[in-house]
């Protein structure tokens, strides 16, 4: 999507904002009490790894375009994590996928942020750090790579 199609130009989310949104999202995930975190390929991997490490939970992976879910042994409660949600297309496809293949698994969808394009019915069903009135380019948080110590990356890793 071209940036000019948005009501206002995108702006880069600051590290402080991203940290606050991530923590809000993580608090809601904790309240759901999952037994596994699932990274939505590709953009959800960083956030999902951080959440899994913080919560000391196993990490699975999901490729929506090919309907492939890699998880541990039949978890009861999982949270899919992606970076953002716009129209909700991937989320809606995942709802159908989970109903068909994992009908006994309770699950939630979590994102760092949604924006004004995200339909209200989708926003009401998901975990989100924040709803933004613009399209944000989230920071890379380059120094926050998964490591022995949260937020620290050692040269030999």
Predicted regions: what is each one?
Residues 1-31:
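Active-site-facing substrate-recognition patch
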Residues 2-8, 96-157:
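PRPP-dependent phosphoribosyltransferase catalytic core
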Residues 6-7, 41, 51-55:
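Conserved P-loop NTPase mechanochemical-coupling segment
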Residues 29-33, 73-74, 102-103:
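Glycine-rich phosphate-binding loop signature in dinucleotide/nucleotide-binding domains
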Residues 32-43:
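Short glycine-rich phosphate-binding loop at a beta-alpha junction
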Residues 36, 60, 79, 108-111:
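A structural signal for isolated positions on well-ordered beta-strands in alpha/beta enzyme cores
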Residues 39-41, 82-85, 111-114:
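Short beta-strand/turn micro-motifs composed of small residues
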Residues 48-82, 86-96:
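Short, glycine/charge-rich flexible loops or terminal/linker lids adjacent to PRPP-binding catalytic cores
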